């Protein structure tokens, strides 16, 4: 009897702490803070992300480079002295000899319109690639935030479930103590209830630890708002797009990034092919001679001569062709990889949804009925309080099993639902 009383003295205060104080904290402390819904968490994370801002600047930089590359080079202003005598009677004179001229000219390098259009197009494609990178970063951010939010939500639900059971166990311990006093209960029953109380307190502690860890994880993206309690769970039975639509794969951000990489490589190839046609330079010069002689104007054209195209231009084209082949191979590999991942994630999501619904239809009613029957038997004098606790613990375990399945289904849903950031008009529910 003294041993049982000692155990109870150690367990019961902790049990009260979790079953009463924690419930009061949830009721009062969280009431002062507005719940944080998943959509709000996603929006807040995006607004705080410096990576997304950096991607916007990268796209802007690519556009600016493309516009600059499409312009003609700056003209070159040229000055010079031609044919200055260095000996004889007219040594160093700038006006005595008829061949001596002071020259000023302008030279302009001219690229073909097609080449300049390609340079501008390259900047546009590079900007589109940066936008695709931004969308891929955004999709990853939304997925990570959603997973952390879901982990925190279900950790809180788990703690709440164990707190309710802890309060029930507390009542049973009180009843057992009264029963021992009037001879209806015995010490072994009380010890068994106190063991359940200790186990329940540990479960609450573990769930609260998981909730704190999830809060710390999500604070990386949300800052102080991570301390707000989670709002209602999202509808994890419906996706924002039809996973059976073959076009979904092409809209995945990772696929779009590699598709833009391929387009960029193809643009570089076209530029390399236009490199066979050299850029011309046109020069106009004005030459001033001595007062006794006429001034002159010169016009000239400079054309590079590709003497060894097989060693320069052709090798540049071959390098660009290899880059195109590499980009296409990476795109095809990513399509296969992401297609397999998408199919696997869809099957996992549907399977978890089916299992959770099946247990809700079968296991939960059975466990609840068993707990009711155990209590009725005890009230009628045909059962024991230990049997009541066992049945109620079984009911809690059943609800925990369903809760874990719902959490896993919600995580699978998040990986699918936020794989696309643009969504789709159609929705598809899990069968």
Regions from the PLM with identified roles:
Residues 32-88, 95, 99-100, 109-111, ...:
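Bacterial Sec-pathway N-terminal export signals of envelope proteins
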Residues 53, 76-97, 109-138, 153-156, ...:
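Small/polar (Gly/Ser/Thr/Ala-rich) solvent-exposed segments
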Residues 54-69, 130, 137, 141-164, ...:
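Amphipathic alpha-helical coiled-coil segments
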Residues 120-124, 187-196, 385-393:
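Short, charged, amphipathic alpha-helical segments
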């Amino acid at each position: 009897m003294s041993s049982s009383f000692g155990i109870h003295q150690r367990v019961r205060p902790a049990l009260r702490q979790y079953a009463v104080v924690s419930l009061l904290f949830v009721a009062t402390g969280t009431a002062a803070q507005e719940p944080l819904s998943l959509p709000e968490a996603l929006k807040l994370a995006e607004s705080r992300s410096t990576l997304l801002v950096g991607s916007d600047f990268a796209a802007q930089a690519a556009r600016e480079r493309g516009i600059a590359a499409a312009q003609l080079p700056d003209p070159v202003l040229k000055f010079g002295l031609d044919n200055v005598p260095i000996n004889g009677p007219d040594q160093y004179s700038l006006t005595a000899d008829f061949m001596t001229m002071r020259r000023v000219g302008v030279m302009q390098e001219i690229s073909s319109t097609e080449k300049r259009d390609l340079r501008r197009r390259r900047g546009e494609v590079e900007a589109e690639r940066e936008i695709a990178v931004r969308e891929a970063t955004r999709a990853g951010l939304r997925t990570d935030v959603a997973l952390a939010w879901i982990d925190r939500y279900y950790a809180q639900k788990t703690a709440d479930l164990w707190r309710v059971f802890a309060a029930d166990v507390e009542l049973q311990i009180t009843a057992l103590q009264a029963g021992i006093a009037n001879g209806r209960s015995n010490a072994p029953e009380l010890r068994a209830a106190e063991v359940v109380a200790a186990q329940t307190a540990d479960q609450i502690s573990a769930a609260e630890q998981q909730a704190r860890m999830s809060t710390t994880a999500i604070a990386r993206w949300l800052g102080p708002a991570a301390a707000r309690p989670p709002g209602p769970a999202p509808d994890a039975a419906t996706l924002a797009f039809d996973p059976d639509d073959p076009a979904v794969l092409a809209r995945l951000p990772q696929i779009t990034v590699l598709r833009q990489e391929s387009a960029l490589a193809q643009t570089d190839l076209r530029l390399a092919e236009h490199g066979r046609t050299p850029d011309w330079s046109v020069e106009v010069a004005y030459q001033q001679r001595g007062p006794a002689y006429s001034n002159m104007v010169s016009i000239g054209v400079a054309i590079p001569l590709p003497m060894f195209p097989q060693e320069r231009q052709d090798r540049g084209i071959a390098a660009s062709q290899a880059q195109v082949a590499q980009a296409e191979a990476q795109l095809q590999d990513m399509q296969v990889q992401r297609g397999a991942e998408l199919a696997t994630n869809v099957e996992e999501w549907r399977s978890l949804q089916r299992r959770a619904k099946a247990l809700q239809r079968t296991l939960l009613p059975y466990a609840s009925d068993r707990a009711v029957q155990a209590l009725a038997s005890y009230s009628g004098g045909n059962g024991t309080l230990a049997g009541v606790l066992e049945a109620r613990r079984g009911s809690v375990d059943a609800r925990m099993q369903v809760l874990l399945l719902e959490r896993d289904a919600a995580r699978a849903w998040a990986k699918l639902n936020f794989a696309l950031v643009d969504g789709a008009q159609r929705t598809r529910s899990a069968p």
